Amino acid sequence: MTNTGLVQSFSQIEPNVLGLETSVTSQICEGLNRALASFQVLYLQYQKHHFTVQGAEFYSLHEFFEDSYGSVKDHVHDLGERLNGLGGVPVAHPLKLAELTCFAIEEDGVFNCRTMLEHDLAAEQAILSLLRRLTAQVESLGDRATRYLLEGILLKTEERAYHIAHFLAPDSLKLA
């Protein structure tokens, strides 16, 4: 594949109309791409769990996984739009996604419900840690709008994490 027609390389940060210097936005875009990659990988993981979940709690988990990948898809959209607005290029190449994601990518295969949820919780917790660091970083760099965006995503990510914790309560998802 050739790069004919390439207008901006992934590592290139263009000037923006938001009044933020590229010395600032380059740091912000790097962090946002880590978050974007992590959410794109998590989207695929939730979608796989939605497709493959089985067992006594099928319906509630099937719906939860669908709601979760829908919410994560919204985060992907918002982060990608913000990256573009800041003059960056949203990450999309599968190998780059794997490189930038902040959590261990689940292996291929079908897992039992408890294991699926444990993998999802570990991913959400890693993303929460990343989001908290990014929120502090963008605030220190003077980008309040990105901070506001990240805080909204942080709240929704926390909510998914504690919902997963409820599914993992000791009296649920027992093996027969």
UniProtKB/Swiss-Prot annotation:
It is found in: Cytoplasm. GO terms for biological process: chromosome condensation; intracellular iron ion homeostasis. It catalyses: 2 Fe(2+) + H2O2 + 2 H(+) = 2 Fe(3+) + 2 H2O. One of its GO terms (molecular function) is oxidoreductase activity, acting on metal ions. Induction: The dps-DNA complex accumulates during stationary phase and under nitrogen, sulfur, and phosphate stress, but not under iron limitation. It is an enzyme of class 1 (oxidoreductase). It comes from the Bacteria. Protects DNA from oxidative damage by sequestering intracellular Fe(2+) ion and storing it in the form of Fe(3+) oxyhydroxide mineral. One hydrogen peroxide oxidizes two Fe(2+) ions, which prevents hydroxyl radical production by the Fenton reaction. Dps binds the chromosome non-specifically, forming a highly ordered and stable dps-DNA co-crystal within which chromosomal DNA is condensed and protected from diverse damages. This is DNA protection during starvation protein. It comes from Synechococcus elongatus (strain ATCC 33912 / PCC 7942 / FACHB-805) (Anacystis nidulans R2). The gene is dps.
